[in-house]
Swiss-Prot record:
Protein function: Induces activation of MAPK14/p38 cascade, when overexpressed. Induces apoptosis, when overexpressed.
Gene name tied to this protein: RELL2
Organism, scientific name: Bos taurus
Biased composition (Basic and acidic residues): 148-158, 172-188
Name of this chain's protein: RELT-like protein 2
Family under the similarity heading: Belongs to the RELT family.
Keyword Phosphoprotein: yes
Biological processes, Gene Ontology terms: positive regulation of cell-substrate adhesion; positive regulation of p38MAPK cascade
Length: 303
């Protein structure tokens, strides 16, 4: 009677093991599902078998205008759709010549055909009747730009040299113009050529310092006279205290019996600025180049 009792224990032990295995498999599947879901969010692809690959159509995310707003493509598309930017691009590329209507890009054209206006985010402004700036802009008539002719663009101004040109942007070099009364160094020119010792811009001396220019009246400028002592204001002498030979006959012409001693004594002190005074009065002095000099003998009554 004691033998059948041990036979009842193994079925209870096997039932507990079955429940335990089911619970373990359930937990493993749940953990695997959570891992695949997390990896999908990070961008990984999870496949149930090695041969099955997902279709490309399933991999592509649904197109949504609200997603990826800060990407480069979105920024470029917004720039192209702007009318002012499209006009600037057309001018830089040089596609439009003369008068023409600014055409929008292909992306803007297709979107305008579908919705009647390009896709954009609606803006709300307080205190304005218009609900959106972009919507009110699309209601305006097409912008017509009156282009300038090529002759006006390519016609250079006097003194300009084009260095670099791209579209409507040009880099030009303008030569500096100087006035009529200025040198290149910025100093004014001296137009008073009649001043004493002045030089004209041609390099020649003026009438006061040398030869006068042809076709102009000769103007003489008198140099300032130096103050002379009373001892030197006598008859001009040259050649070491002797009188000029041209003055001897005139000095002794009136009184042939007079002696030339006072003249020699007064003139022996040195040369006087008599010739310079003659030049100042317009009469050039004649220097005695001959070796013959008239010297009256001492003690003689006359020559």
């Amino acid at each position: 009677m004691s033998e059948p009792q041990p036979d009842l224990e193994p079925p209870q032990h096997g039932l507990y093991m079955l429940f335990l295995l089911v619970l373990v498999f359930f937990l493993m599947g749940l953990v695997g599902f959570m891992i695949c879901h997390v990896l999908k969010k990070k961008g990984y692809r999870c496949r149930t078998s090695r041969g099955s690959e997902p279709d490309d159509a399933q991999l592509q995310p649904p197109e949504d205008d609200d997603m990826n707003e800060d990407t480069v493509e979105r920024i470029v598309r917004c720039i192209i759709q702007n009318e002012a930017n499209a006009e600037a691009l057309k001018e830089m590329l040089g596609d439009s010549e003369g008068e023409g209507t600014v055409q929008l890009s292909s992306v803007d054209a297709t979107s305008s055909l579908q919705d009647g206006a390009p896709s954009h985010h609606h803006t709300v402004h307080l205190g304005s009747s218009a609900p959106c700036i972009h919507c009110s802009r699309n209601k305006r008539p097409p912008l017509v730009r009156q282009g300038r002719s090529k002759e006006g663009k390519s016609r250079p101004r006097p003194g300009e040299t084009t260095v670099f040109s791209v579209g409507r942007f040009r880099v030009t070099h303008i030569e500096k113009r100087y006035g009529l009364h200025e040198h290149r160094d910025g100093s004014p020119t001296d137009r008073s050529w009649g001043s004493g010792g002045g030089q004209d811009p041609g390099g020649g001396q003026g009438p006061g310092g040398g030869q006068p220019r042809t076709g102009m009246p000769a103007i003489e400028s008198l140099p300032p006279e130096r103050p002379q002592p009373p001892a030197l204001a006598s008859t001009p002498m040259q050649n070491g205290g002797l009188r000029d030979s041209s003055r001897v006959p005139r000095a002794l012409e009136g009184n042939p019996g007079a002696s030339a001693e006072p003249m020699l004594g007064a003139g022996g002190r040195g040369p006087s600025p008599g010739p310079a005074r003659k030049e100042a009065n317009g009469q050039p002095s004649k220097q005695d180049t001959s070796d013959h000099q008239v010297s009256p003998p001492r003690g003689a009554g006359g020559v």
